[in-house]
Swiss-Prot record:
Gene name of the record: dnaJ
ZnF CR-type span: 139-217
Sequence ranges assigned to domain J in this UniProt record: 5-70
Name assigned to this protein: Chaperone protein DnaJ
Subcellular location: Cytoplasm
Molecular functions per Gene Ontology: ATP binding; heat shock protein binding; unfolded protein binding; zinc ion binding
Any GO BP: protein refolding
InterPro entries: DnaJ, DnaJ_C, DnaJ_domain, DnaJ_domain_CS, HSP40/DnaJ_pept-bd, HSP_DnaJ_Cys-rich_dom, HSP_DnaJ_Cys-rich_dom_sf, J_dom_sf
Note on domains (UniProt): The J domain is necessary and sufficient to stimulate DnaK ATPase activity. Zinc center 1 plays an important role in the autonomous, DnaK-independent chaperone activity of DnaJ. Zinc center 2 is essential for interaction with DnaK and for DnaJ activity.
Family: Belongs to the DnaJ family.
Length: 380
């Protein structure tokens, strides 16, 4: 059974509020509750998934661990103290009572799914990777270390001390579940004795303490393709947690997070930057040097350029992901007012201002237009 992303299960974004998560869970739980779908295995499975996702995402500490480490961060056998694993409906405590106590009489429990003696696919993992804008634009290879679980080499995954074997659970007879009668409803519940495994370990392994798996770390080289954006996911098949009882391993999802850049702002495939130019260059025109991801480039500034004007350098943006196209670089020029002027500079500016007074509409069209609007406003 594949472990799905908890946010995808509830249909919410990763920045969803607690209230949004609760509303999403209530909607799904009402739709797929076993009492409303007594003969639907699909509804039963979706109800289970929604309950498990809500249990994790409604708890701030568990949610933080899940965001950082994925399913490994909330697997009780991983030593992180969260809920997870291959539980049935049991073990969710307040998550179920909080939502359904007022609907089904409080304290209700439901069960389903096989015990842990069945074959299960390993959990998917998530790794948040920070990269620079240059690395995102050109592509790169990064080495990462991820927390994971591996089969205990001492007991070979049985959880029992070498030389001993787990025994069949006397409570559920190895089924991993027990059935409870509550009023008109017959409800399955994870066995409280073996917690769904169908087995009891009377003499646990002194290395993994009965879990059958131990915490570990592994190093991977991840190829980041050119053009990735913030929040893109790179799937590494089979690099998640190992499966149980011979099941296939899960996948690792590397999520890219691009660091803020000192010069550029990214907008899809396009880049934006601000370039200060002098008053004289704006008025008379000239050539300036601007930065690009490929190095310095020349930009011709036409005469009479205004502050805020945007110049496009085609093909100087970000390469499209898995395509040959490139975005553009949008250069926003900002005309700087000169400061700390010398006496001579002040003299020349005063002379320029005096000359300009004779034809304000010609030399300062925006100012003249504004003055005309003021006259109309005041009835002048």
């Amino acid at each position: 059974m594949s472990k799905k992303d908890f946010y995808d299960v509830l249909g919410v974004n990763r920045d969803a509020s607690d209230d949004d998560i609760k509303k999403a869970y209530r909607k799904l739980a009402m739709k797929y509750h076993p009492d409303r779908n007594p003969d639907s295995k699909d509804a039963e499975e979706k109800f289970k998934e929604a309950k498990e996702a809500y249990e994790i995402l409604s708890d701030a500490q568990k949610r933080a661990a899940y965001d950082q480490y994925g399913h490994a961060g909330v697997d009780p056998q991983a030593g992180f103290g969260g809920a997870g694993g291959q539980q049935g409906f049991g073990g969710f405590g307040d998550a179920f009572a909080d939502i359904f106590g007022d609907i089904f009489g409080g304290g209700a429990r439901a069960g389903g799914g096989g015990g842990r003696n069945a074959v299960y696919r390993g959990s998917d993992l998530r790794y948040n990777l920070e990269i620079t804008l240059e690395e995102a634009a050109r592509g790169c290879e990064k080495q990462i270390r991820i927390p994971t679980m591996e089969e205990c080499s001492h007991c070979h995954g049985s959880g029992a001390k070498p030389g001993t074997e787990p025994k069949t659970c006397p409570t559920c007879g190895g089924a991993g579940q027990v059935r409870m009668q509550q009023g008109f409803f017959s409800i399955q519940q994870t066995c409280p004795t073996c917690h769904g495994s169908g087995k009891q370990i009377t003499d646990p392994c002194n290395i993994c303490h009965g879990a059958g798996r131990v915490k570990s770390q592994k190093t991977l080289n991840v190829k980041i393709p050119a053009g990735v954006d913030d929040g893109d996911r790179i799937r590494l098949s089979g690099e998640g947690e190992p499966g149980t009882n011979g099941g296939p391993a899960g996948d690792l999802y590397v999520v890219t997070h691009i660091k803020p850049h000192a010069v550029f702002e990214r907008d899809g495939m396009d880049l934006h930057c601000e370039m200060p130019i002098s008053f004289a260059t704006a008025a008379l025109g000239g050539e300036i040097e601007i930065p690009t991801l490929d190095g310095a480039a020349k930009l011709r500034i036409p005469a009479e350029t205004q502050s805020g004007q945007v110049f496009r350098l085609r093909g100087k943006g970000i390469k499209a992901l898995r395509a040959s196209q490139h975005g553009d670089l949008m250069c926003h020029v900002q005309v700087e007012t000169p400061v700390k002027l010398t006496d001579r500079q002040k003299e020349l500016l005063r002379e320029f201002d005096a000359i300009s007074q004779g034809a304000p509409a010609k030399h300062n069209p925006k100012a003249q237009s504004f003055m005309d609007k003021l006259k109309d406003f005041f009835g002048g």
